[in-house]
Amino acid sequence: MDCSCVSDLLFAPPALPALWTPGFAFPDWAYKPESSPGSRQIQLWHFILELLQKEEYQGVIAWQGDYGEFVIKDPDEVARLWGIRKCKPHMNYDKLSRALRYYYNKRILHKTKGKRFTYKFNFSKVVLVNYPLLDMAAAATGSPLLLTPSPFGGAPGPDAPPLTPETLQTLFSAPRLGEPGARTPLFTSETDKLRLDSPFPFLGSGATSYSKPPGLLGPYGRAFPEYPWNFNPYLTGPFPKLPPSLYPPHFYPNPLASSLGHLPSSGAGGGPTATPLLASTGEGLGPERPSGLAAAPRLALPGAGGPEAALGGKEDSDSELEITDVSGCSSDSEGDEGLPAPPKAKAGKGGTGS
């Protein structure tokens, strides 16, 4: 059924407080066309703003304290009016307060600590839009703008566009794609020109949604000096092109160095190198042999001498090669190393039997 019980709220001329006008709303995600006053789909914070505009409800809900702060003087009456508007006769303040807590996370409003039934709108999120009551406020005050500080921290330049509701709406809210009949965006995409004209042109170049507000970013007309690292950070491109010397080593890995690291080398490291490998086989030992390889293991046959004898006697021996470390061994006949053992024992054994 249709609920037009409080429709007279919409047609009475609004009472304008001294510090604000009713032509404001919040970001695009909170403002919907079907949430306009007079609609059953209105949101609770819109309804609260409507009540705050009416002098006849000053005993029910009213502004007080800091800018944007209001107090609900009669919670049951506010809940009853909200139930009439939403066609919910069983509405009470407990349900209404739960709906208000939903806006805490959205940062539309928050509860004032230490004050009962007192809330405060977060006007840092407020943007001007074509609110239905804006025309009435403009006719009554001559200006549709809120009496708030400029969001740009100062007066606009001479070539800046006039501050209109559409201007601030475009500044503070992202464009919604796919909406039929959407407003013409205030900013036009001039990414290349913006990159050259803005103070930080190296921050990006391919962002199609990044646009330049006319009259807000002036040309950066000074000549940039020469830099000691021989590059200009204001070059065009998606990212600044710094020289490799300014980056950490992992940005520019050396593939040649990484591939050579797996090859054996004759460095001072403690790993196996090519020279010890040759030293262990007795080949390639020249005058450049390091002194630390004097005690390297050698290949030797049982009863044979140095590496020459070991390599020469390999064909005549049926036994397998044994790796023998003779560096620490001592012998009485060290000078006769490499000579076969004299057949003394064999001759003595035969002599005893004869």
From Swiss-Prot:
SMART domains: ETS (SM00413). GO terms for biological process: cell differentiation; regulation of transcription by RNA polymerase II. SUPFAM superfamilies: Winged helix' DNA-binding domain (SSF46785). Residues 290-312 have a biased composition (Low complexity). Gene3D superfamilies: Winged helix-like DNA-binding domain superfamily/Winged helix DNA-binding domain. PROSITE patterns: ETS_DOMAIN_1, ETS_DOMAIN_2, ETS_DOMAIN_3. Keywords: DNA-binding, Nucleus, Transcription, Transcription regulation. InterPro entries: Ets_dom (IPR000418), ETS_fam (IPR046328), WH-like_DNA-bd_sf (IPR036388), WH_DNA-bd_sf (IPR036390). One of its GO terms (molecular function) is DNA-binding transcription factor activity, RNA polymerase II-specific. Residues 42-122 bind DNA. It comes from the Eukaryota. The keyword DNA-binding applies. It is found in: Nucleus. GO terms for cellular component: nucleus. Pfam families: Ets. Residues 263-354 are annotated as: Disordered. PANTHER family: ETS, ETS DOMAIN-CONTAINING TRANSCRIPTION FACTOR ERF-LIKE. Belongs to the ETS family. This is ETS domain-containing transcription factor ERF-like. It comes from Homo sapiens.
